[in-house]
C-alpha cells in the first residue's frame, strides 16, 4: 500500500512547469524587445541563458551609439566653425579682401587720375600726365641703382626700393589734393576731400606692406619721392611754363604732343603688363 501510494505521488508530481507568472512574462517580453532592437543594427542571436548579458550589452551599445552620434555631430560642428573662421581670417588678413583691393588699387588710382585730367582739361592736366609717367620712369631708374631686394616671402625677384606703387600713388594723390585746393580754396569741403584722398592713398600704400610685396622702408621712400616729385613738377608748371603755355601756340602744341606720346606709351605698358599680371 505504501509502495503504491508513493508511486501515485511520483506520477502526480509534474516533471516540468509550463506556468508563467506575470513577472517572468514581462521580463521575457522586455528581453525580446531588446533583442529585436539590437538585431536591427547587427544580427545577434539571443538565448535564454544570456538575458542579463543581452540587456547590459544593449544598454551599452545604445549609450555608445548615442555618444558616438553626439561626438560626431560635435566634431562636424567644430570643423565647420574652424573652416568658417579660417575663411574669415583669409578674407580679412590678406588672403582675400585685401589681396583683391591691392590688385585693384592701380586701376582705382588710374581712374581717379584720369577723371581729374578730364575735369581739368587744361595745360596743367597735360603737364601732370607727363609728370606722372616721368615719375614712374624715375622709380624704375632708382630701383636699378639701389637694387634692394623685396621681402623673402614674395615670389617677385625684381628690386623693391623704392616701391613703384607707393611712388605713383603718392604723386597722383598729391596732385589731386593740389587740384582740389586750387579749385575750392582752403575751406572745410576742400580739407575734407583732401583728407579723404590722402587716407585712400595711404591705405593703398599700406597694402604693399601687408601683402608682403615691399618692406616698410621701401614704401616710405617711394611715398616721399613721389610726393616731392609731384610738388616740384607742379611748382615748375606754375612758375615757369604756365605763362608760356597761355601765350604761345607752339608751347601748347609741344606740351600736347609730349602728353599724348607719354599717354600712349603708358597705355601700351598697361596692356603688356597689368593685364598679364591679372591673368
Curated annotation (Swiss-Prot):
Topological type in the membrane: Multi-pass membrane protein
Chain segment of the transit peptide: 1-88
Molecular-function GO terms, alphabetical: phosphatidate phosphatase activity
Transit peptide is among the record's keywords: yes
Listed SUPFAM superfamilies: Acid phosphatase/Vanadium-dependent haloperoxidase
One Pfam family cited in the UniProt record for this chain: PAP2
Compartments (UniProt record): Plastid, Chloroplast inner membrane
Keyword line: Chloroplast, Hydrolase, Membrane, Plastid, Plastid inner membrane, Transit peptide, Transmembrane, Transmembrane helix
Tissue and organ expression note: Expressed in root tips, root branch points, cotyledons and leaves.
CDD domains: PAP2_dolichyldiphosphatase
Keyword field contains Hydrolase: yes
Description of pH dependence: Optimum pH is 7.0.
GO CC terms of this entry: chloroplast; chloroplast inner membrane
Regulation: Inhibited by Mg(2+).
Protein's job: Exhibits phosphatidate phosphatase (PAP) activity in vitro. May play a secondary role as PAP in plastids.
UniProt name for this protein: Lipid phosphate phosphatase epsilon 1, chloroplastic
Organism encoding this protein: Arabidopsis thaliana
Classification lineage: Eukaryota, Viridiplantae, Streptophyta, Embryophyta, Tracheophyta
Amino acid at each position: 500500500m505504501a509502495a503504491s501510494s508513493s508511486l501515485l505521488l511520483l506520477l502526480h508530481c509534474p516533471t516540468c512547469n509550463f506556468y508563467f507568472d506575470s513577472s517572468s512574462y514581462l521580463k521575457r517580453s522586455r528581453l525580446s524587445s531588446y533583442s529585436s532592437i539590437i538585431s536591427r543594427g547587427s544580427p545577434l542571436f539571443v538565448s535564454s541563458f544570456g538575458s542579463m548579458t543581452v540587456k547590459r550589452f544593449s544598454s551599452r551599445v545604445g549609450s555608445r551609439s548615442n555618444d558616438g552620434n553626439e561626438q560626431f555631430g560635435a566634431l562636424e560642428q567644430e570643423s565647420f566653425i574652424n573652416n568658417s573662421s579660417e575663411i574669415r581670417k583669409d578674407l580679412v588678413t590678406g588672403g582675400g579682401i585685401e589681396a583683391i583691393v591691392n590688385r585693384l588699387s592701380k586701376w582705382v588710382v588710374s581712374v581717379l587720375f584720369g577723371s581729374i585730367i578730364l575735369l581739368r582739361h587744361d595745360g596743367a592736366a597735360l603737364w601732370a600726365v607727363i609728370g606722372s609717367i616721368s615719375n614712374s620712369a624715375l622709380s624704375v631708374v632708382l630701383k636699378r641703382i639701389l637694387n634692394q631686394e623685396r621681402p623673402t616671402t614674395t615670389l617677385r625677384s625684381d628690386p623693391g626700393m623704392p616701391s613703384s606703387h607707393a611712388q605713383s600713388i603718392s604723386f597722383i594723390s598729391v596732385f589731386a589734393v593740389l587740384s582740389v585746393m586750387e579749385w575750392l580754396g582752403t575751406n572745410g569741403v576742400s580739407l575734407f576731400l583732401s583728407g579723404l584722398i590722402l587716407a585712400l592713398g595711404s591705405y593703398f600704400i599700406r597694402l604693399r606692406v601687408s601683402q608682403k610685396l615691399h618692406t616698410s622702408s621701401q614704401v616710405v621712400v617711394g611715398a616721399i619721392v613721389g610726393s616731392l616729385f609731384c610738388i616740384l613738377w607742379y611748382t615748375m608748371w606754375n612758375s615757369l611754363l604756365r605763362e608760356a603755355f597761355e601765350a604761345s601756340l607752339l608751347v601748347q602744341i609741344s606740351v600736347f604732343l609730349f602728353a599724348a606720346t607719354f599717354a600712349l606709351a603708358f597705355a601700351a605698358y598697361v596692356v603688356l603688363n597689368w593685364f598679364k599680371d591679372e591673368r
